[in-house]
Amino acid sequence: MASQPAGGSPPKPWEKEGNTSGPNPFRPPSNTSTAGSVEASGTANPGEVVPPPVNRPNTAANMNSLSRPVPARPWEQQNYGSTMGGGYGSNLGMTSGYGSGTYGSALGGYGSSYGGGMYGGSSMYRGGYGGGGLYGSSGMYGGGAMGGYGGTMGGYGMGMGTGMGMGMGMGMGGPYGSQDPNDPFNQPPSPPGFWISFLRVMQGAVNFFGRVAMLIDQNTQAFHMFMSALLQLFDRGGMLYGELARFVLRMLGVRTRPRKMQQPPQGPNGLPLPHQPHGNQNYLEGPKTAAPGGGGGWDNVWGN
C-alpha cells in the first residue's frame, strides 16, 4: 500500500494497490481478464465461469442473415417522389402522380380513384375519376362515377357500352345506368329545349292571369266597400235631415203627432210577422190652439 504523505489527504480508492482480499469495483481492468473484472466488481462469485464478450456487429449480421429481411423504406425506393404517385405504386409500375401504370394509379390497385392504366383509374372494376386504359372508362364493366359493375346505380347500365360493342350499348341499362342520386357531381340529364320553352310560356300565362284575377278581386272589394259607404252616408244623411227638420219645426211651433200605431199583422200563432219596415212612423200635424187657461205656445215644445 502506498505511504500516506504527512498532512495530506488519504489516497483515493483508485490510487491504492490492487488486492484480492475482497470485491473491489474500482480495480483497473487493464491488467486483468474479463472474469477477473466481473469477479472484482462483485457481480460473480470466485471461481464462477463468465462467458466471453459478445461481438455485437457480428451478432447483428447473424440475426439479419437468419431472420426476415427488413423491407425497404418508401424513400429508399427507386420511383418514389413523383407528385403523389410513386409512394403507392412504384412496385406496381407507377411513374406519375395521378397517372398510369400496369395495375394502378396514385392510390394503386384495381379501380383506383385518380388515374388510368391497364387496370387502374377507370378500369375494368372502375375507379372514380380516372382516364382510360385497356379496360378504361367506357370499358367492359365501366361507366360509373363511384365504382362497381356498371356504374353507381348498378346493373350493366352504361358500362356495357362501347367496350363490348354498340349492340349492347343502351340495351341493358339505358341512359340511367351510370347515375347516382346521392352523387352531387352527377346531375340528371336536362330536358329537351322545346319542353323548357313550353313550360316558360305556361308560367308566363299563369302569372298573367293570376295578376288579372287578383286585380279584379281587389277592385270588386273596393267597389263593394264604396257602395256600402255611400249607402251608409245616405242613411245617416236622412237621419240628420229628420232631426234638423224636427228641430226647426219645433222652433216654428209646429208640433208633430206620432203616427198611429198600426196593428202589425199576426202570424198563425198570434206572433207578429217579421220585416215590418213601416212601423212607428211620425206624421206632421197642423198648428194647434193653445190650451185653455194655460201657458203660452212654447209649453211642451220638446214634448211629443
Curated annotation (Swiss-Prot):
Disruption phenotype: Lethal, when homozygous. Residues 19-44, 56-67 have a biased composition (Polar residues). InterPro entries: Pex13. It is found in: Peroxisome membrane. Residues 1-78, 258-304 are annotated as: Disordered. One of its GO terms (cellular component) is peroxisomal membrane. Keywords: Membrane, Peroxisome, Peroxisome biogenesis, Protein transport, Translocation, Transport. It comes from the Eukaryota. This is Peroxisomal membrane protein 13. The gene is PEX13.
